[in-house]
């Protein structure tokens, strides 16, 4: 009987060691909306990217589109609120981007961070680098986006995600003139 218990304990310990040590929800969707667009009214929209739009976004941004269904809200008076996910090193990072009426980044908020390390991507100074960026901006580490030592993959993947969302705005959301 004792031997059986020991054999059950070892797999349980190993399973616990492979689980992420930290998963933190910082903001709900409503809290992120309030942080980016205080006092504004937002209307959730149902938008699904077509196959052609997905291909064009991938070609333009250089980033794979994982989901065709967009999580987007249109802001009364102009602008967009978009919730997206990217992979950090091993786990998803959920973030929100607010875009102005002309498609510039208004603000970036990290909503859920599930990695053990690299939470510095939540630092306001680092996130401020994205403000004003539009479609066509490089959004590359050590170029127009400063890398965070110890959070390189999270930094890179968030920059890639924002670049993809800017391409999504340009190719699928921007009002036609």
Regions of interest found by a model, annotated:
Residues 7-16:
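Bacterial N-terminal signal peptides
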């Amino acid at each position: 009987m004792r031997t059986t218990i020991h054999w059950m304990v070892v797999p349980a310990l190993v399973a616990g060691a492979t689980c992420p040590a930290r998963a933190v929800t910082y903001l709900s969707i409503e809290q992120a909306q309030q942080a980016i667009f205080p006092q504004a009214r937002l209307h959730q929209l149902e938008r699904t990217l077509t196959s052609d739009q997905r291909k064009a976004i991938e070609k333009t941004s250089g980033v794979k589109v994982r989901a065709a269904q967009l999580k987007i809200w249109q802001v009364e008076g102009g602008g967009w609120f978009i919730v997206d996910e990217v992979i950090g090193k091993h786990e998803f990072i959920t973030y929100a981007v607010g875009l102005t009426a002309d498609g510039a980044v208004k603000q970036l908020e990290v909503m859920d961070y599930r990695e053990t390390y690299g939470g510095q991507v939540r630092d306001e100074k680092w996130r401020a680098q994205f403000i004003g960026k539009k479609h066509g901006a490089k959004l590359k580490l050590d170029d127009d986006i400063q890398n965070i030592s110890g959070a390189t993959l999270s930094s890179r993947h968030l920059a890639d995600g924002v670049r993809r969302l800017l391409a999504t705005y340009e190719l699928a959301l921007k009002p036609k003139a």
